Amino acid sequence: MDRFLDAAIAEAEKGRADGGIPIGSVLVIGDEIAGRGHNQRIQRGSVVLHAEMDCLENAGRLSASVYRNATIYSTLSPCSMCTGAILLYGIPQVVVGENRTFQGPQHLLEQAGIDVKVLDDPRCISMMTSFIAENPELWNEDIGE
């Protein structure tokens, strides 16, 4: 098991327990978690608080050199907005729990030379599959459909 993916899953579960969309993210620098977050669009009535955005916000202000040595983990493939933040800050590695229930613009990350690893983690797949089946309206709103 990957302890950083486990931490992202714990964030996703926290979001689900709070009535939100179960997507979690952690920002890793070296061997330490610098930021954690989960999707809070529902809980906070936000249009931008996806898991990766919440994670980056919770990491606080970091220098460009720090981001360029970081890895961001997400339980789900980053959307266009979150991909843009990853590109903006030059985060060189993205680890994705799963991209079966939603595939963001992974090709944009790869074209920019970012190392993208998709783990196809069954826990992430199950969490999202269940949520989407139970809450299709919330899910469609989250992905802009």
Residue ranges and their predicted role:
Residues 23-31:
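Short beta-strand scaffold segments in enzyme catalytic cores
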Residues 65-69:
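Short helix-loop-beta connector
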